[in-house]
Amino acid sequence: MGEAFHQHERGEISDEAFAEALCHEMALPLSYEQFSHGWQAVFVALRPEVIAIMHKLREQGHRVVVLSNTNRLHTTFWPEEYPEIRDAADHIYLSQDLGMRKPEARIYQHVLQAEGFSPSDTVFFDDNADNIEGANQVGITSILVKDKTTIPDYFAKVLC
């Protein structure tokens, strides 16, 4: 996806402008409503094992935050569909609210500063290798999520 995708995740263009640009780019004659409905298909299921780990970390006194590249279309959908995510996190940082997106170094630096975290005391998980590299460049321990066992396997060693 092109620059309109990145602009949308930074909150720089409206949902309607994004839908129009993407439909034009992909030669899809969709209405805004059709596009919006299809755009939510990316959400397939909650990961209860990860939610449980997040709760356990918080019970142990760790701060758990989520950093997500997202957009207004998704933020009107997933909080209602998956309230467990918000309940399991101390804070959720969204690219569209911050005006920056992963893998830009400044987004990781922003979260570190806002949370009072040092890179060496932070662990970051993502399923995108570019985002892992971006976090690594600011000194954050970063784990590429390859499948549903990556996060539970990592914390099985740490939490036991």
Q: Residues of each region from the PLM?
A:
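N-terminal helical cap/lid subdomain that shapes the substrate entry/recognition surface
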Residues: M1-A52, E59-Q60, N71-T75
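A generic secondary-structure signal
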Residues: E25, I53-K56, A114, K157
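Anion (oxyanion) recognition and catalysis
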Residues: R58-E59, N136
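Structured helix-beta-strand junction loops
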Residues: Q60-G61, A88
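A generic structural motif
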Residues: G61-R63, I140
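Phosphate-binding loop of NTP-binding sites
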Residues: V66
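Asp-based, Mg2+/Mn2+-dependent phosphohydrolase catalytic module
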Residues: N71-R72, T76-C160
